[in-house]
Amino acid sequence: MMQINLSIQPTEKALELIDGLLETRKDTYDLYQLVLRKVNLLLEQNEEQKANETIRQYLYLTEIREMEVEKLIVRCQYDEAIRLLDEGIEIAKEEIYPGTDSKWLEIKLKIYETTNRASEVIDICRLLFVTGRDKLTYYNKLKTLIPKEQWKSFLDTMMKETEFSNYFSFGGSVEADIYVKEQDNERLFTLLSSTRYDQLEALMRYAHYLKDTHSEQLIAMYTSSLNDYAERKMGRRNYEFIAQVLPCIHKLKGGQTAVKNIVAEFRIKYKRRPAMMEVLKDF
């Protein structure tokens, strides 16, 4: 409706209406659309100075700042683009806009990559690894940029600065994935040992990497977690999950015997759970 009303108004009247809307809607998520409408109307009137003033006034809006940064990048005005990005990062910190600072850092990274500024690329990748979400992307970039003889020390320091999630999402963990890539078996084992949430899923995903070095301890962890799970969980779906865990134990050294012992114990302990007995009949 707003678009229709504005489109049938003379330009001056349309600008007046937009100014009113900018005041009454200043806290709405689509405010930037009104700003762009005003800027376009001013440019149609060859009012470039007023258009630029409007843009500067609303640079605190993410969409407007991003639009201006993109224009500067197209014109290869990289230093000015970085200045706007740094301003945006400070605003994001002050206003606590989650994710916005990472957005600006990612654009800065692209500029530094385009201009072959290796030192700045490393600094931004490191910051995005420590504070951002897509950690494996920046881990992989950094591993190609840091000299091999410096990599272990660099990574150790960076990992200590990083706060990783205690949860294994769908059994997965960025921290664990990095230990796998680095073949750091001791730290992977320590992480699995300290996991208190979804430990079975974590073991199913990562234990096989440690079968040559930690099978005995992993079998003990599996057995303890599986006993606890069986004690607390009932129903066919949960029993089928137990049946998915057992082959993972089987792959470890000594796992075949461990599976036989677990199943034998369950057949005695849970003999009054017919659905479990049916699910375990093939073990």
Task: Label every model-predicted segment.
Residues M1-F283:
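Eukaryote-biased, non-catalytic alpha-solenoid scaffold regions
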